[in-house]
Regions:
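Helix-turn-helix/homeodomain-like alpha-helical modules used for DNA recognition
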Residues: 80-106
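Short amphipathic alpha-helical boundary/capping segments
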Residues: 11-20
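Short amphipathic alpha helix immediately N-terminal
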Residues: 22-34
């Protein structure tokens, strides 16, 4: 998994992580957010590397299904990109839109 995949998965986990099982969420967070290896996660959770791999795969697939159905991350990314474009055109908007940035990035 490359860095872009990890960043994308971290965004999905942030938005939809509560919809996963506790075990999937825990293992996925260790793997993606804490940058632990499958082996390290397995040791920490007291399971096999294969169990972690299965949890990570199924969790990632579930997160993508949620995003495909809801589209919250894509919408947030599109709004942030548009705000960036607008503030690049008119720097004075940056201060006025600061609260919007905080809400979206928060």
């Amino acid at each position: 998994m490359d860095i872009q995949d990890r960043v994308r998965l971290a965004s999905l986990l942030s938005e939809y992580g509560a919809l996963l099982t506790g075990r999937q969420r825990e293992m996925l967070a260790m793997y993606v957010e804490m940058d632990m290896s499958l082996f390290e996660v397995a040791e920490e959770c007291g399971v096999t590397r294969q169990a972690v791999l299965d949890a990570v795969r199924h969790g990632a697939e579930a997160l993508q299904r949620y995003e495909d159905a809801v589209g919250k991350v894509a919408l947030k990314d599109a709004v942030l990109a548009e705000l960036d474009r607008l503030t690049a055109e008119d720097g004075s908007l940056k201060g006025k839109l600061g609260a919007v940035y905080e809400i979206l990035e928060g």
